Amino acid sequence: MDNWITARLAGTLRSAADPLVVDLGYGATPVTAVELAARLARVRSDVRVLGLEIDADRVAAAMPAADPPRLTFARGGFELAGERPAIVRAANVLRQYDEAAAARAWLTLRAGLAPGGVLVEGTCDELGRLGCWVLLEQGGPRSLTFACRVEAIERPGQLAERLPKALIHRNVPGEAIHEFLAAFDAAWDAAAAVSTFGPRQRWIAAGTALARSGWPVDVTRTRHGELTVDWTAVAPRCSA
């Protein structure tokens, strides 16, 4: 997720009046916030990363890693501690919520963004091999990105287990996300011959095939094991 943010949201960060980025729910250790700050500093030297946790003990434990003003930590949740960040990163934060509560959290987080700001919300496995995230602007979701270590998957459909809360229960017949994942698996299967050159080339070929068949996908970062699809192509169709 961090590499994608650095590459795809560099323009958002560079144009921000206040280059504040929030790492929401960084966890038991501040590693993700530390790494995010280091990566984003290469995009904009005056970036400020604020790690937020609702657990005061986690905030206290992170303090030795603080490097103000570049990296700070505070207690806070979906209200973003009253800040107006240009970018919010929320990884593995909403999985424990039900779909309705997660939708409310999206609304709260989007309302707290600075003008032109974005929210990146999603999940990944413990080893960072499989992940999915949604890019949201103040007006709503814009895209869904699938990411993996291509050597770790047998088919792209495995990423369904990492879908964000808004979609994870929608991977059923009649829903757009189900159709997209079926098409992705079919494109992967059709690219079997390319696997001679490695799984990365097979992933690239599958993404290219999806684009050619009319799916609104961005294949710019397929060489990195990522594929982004417009939210309109996968958004929920049926009432929860």
Regions found by a protein language model. Give the residues of each.
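Class I SAM-dependent methyltransferase Rossmann-like catalytic core
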Residues: 1-19, 23, 28-30
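Class I SAM-dependent methyltransferase SAM/SAH-binding core
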Residues: 27-80
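Short, conserved active-site loop motifs that form the nucleotide-linked donor/cofactor pocket
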Residues: 70-72, 86, 117
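A short SAM/SAH-binding and catalytic strip from SAM-dependent methyltransferases
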Residues: 84-103
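A short glycine-rich, Lys/Arg-flanked "PGG" loop and its adjoining helix->strand segment in the class I
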Residues: 95, 103-115
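Conserved beta-strand signature within the Rossmann-like core of class I S-adenosyl-L-methionine
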Residues: 113-128
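A conserved mid-domain beta-alpha-beta active-site/ligand-binding segment of alpha/beta enzyme cores
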Residues: 132-202
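Conserved Class I S-adenosyl-L-methionine
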Residues: 176-240
